Amino acid sequence: MHKGEMTVDVVCFPHTLATFPMFTMAAQATFLSIAHQKKLRCERFLNEMDRIIPWQQMLDVMRPHYYDNAVGRPAKDMKLMLKIYFLQQWNDLSDPAMEEAIYDRCSFQKFLQIDLLSDTVPDETTILNFRHLLEEHRLQEQLFAIVNALLAQKGYLMKKGTIVDATLIAAPSSTKNREGKRDPEMHQTKKGNQWYFGMKGHIGVDADSGVVHSVAGTAANIHDRVMLHTLLHGSEKAIFGDQGYACDGDKDACRRNGEIHWFVSDRGRRNHPLSNGQRKKNRKRSSVRSKVEHPFHVIKNLWKHTKVRYRGIAKNTLQLYALFALANLYMKRRQLLA
């Protein structure tokens, strides 16, 4: 060995994992168990949602706009197509990925009541055309209204107070696409020390139940405060929001009204920091305001809707109506199933 050279000890393992059948069998059993548990959770979720979604009311609203089969091939069953659309929302699937998933996932076939041996699976073009039909007639807004009417009837939408909030939804910032440019309706905004490009989803949430009653979509550079009145239903006795909604004019208007309590967190200003009393009030208000995070958690963390799927604010806002309609049902599923 020459001076300065390193020595490396090589340890050889003459046996592979295959020589340890107990180990491999245990590992396989673990993987199978995890896969089985995941399948059971998916099937349970789909079964519960199938039972609580007001299918008949939704189909009645859609029927006047659906294909009448006067010419061309017979249209696919309306309920089947609506179920496929909902599967896309729950799993963040594109139209081609949705078609493929129907073939691959038994839980989807069971939910859709499709037999691959005898039934024809809708292709990606059929799935796309159905979504365009929903968008053309803004049916997602009507589906949202149907869900909230059901929840109000059951006593889960009190309308005594509203919590307002917004979330950023990212859009592709690259220009490497067919048009060679970014979506002109999307814009950038700064949050903390980081810049984001995309849109905002704004919601008004029932302060008692946490149910979303108002939805709006804007470019990311629109200030939260601008959307406040759009998110109110008009019968509130209290308004909750973070510092982004702080506005002396609105606060004074509530005081003059005398019937609406303003619980929006106070904002500190340059040379005018918050007092200890204001900080204490803000902490107390944030405990109520946390309910607005639940629907965002459902659509962004559970259903992975963190990026826009379409170009333009309008189409993505309509998708938000569908997502929050389903999120409302999901959050109240135990009560609805009881």
Model-derived regions: residue spans:
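Alpha-helical support elements that line or immediately flank enzyme active sites
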Residues: 80-92
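Secondary-structure capping and boundary motifs in well-ordered enzyme cores
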Residues: 51-54, 73-80, 118-122, 284, ...
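Charged, often Cys/His-bearing segments associated with DNA-binding zinc-finger transcription factors
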Residues: 1-56, 63-64, 338
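An N-terminal domain-cap segment
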Residues: 59-79
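A short, flexible helix-boundary coil/loop motif
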Residues: 302, 336-338
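Helix-centered, glycine/charged polyanion-binding patches within enzymatic domains
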Residues: 27-29, 237-238, 243-314, 318
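A short glycine/serine-rich beta->alpha loop
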Residues: 67-72, 116, 310-313
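Polybasic low-complexity intrinsically disordered regions
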Residues: 13, 29, 87, 96, ...
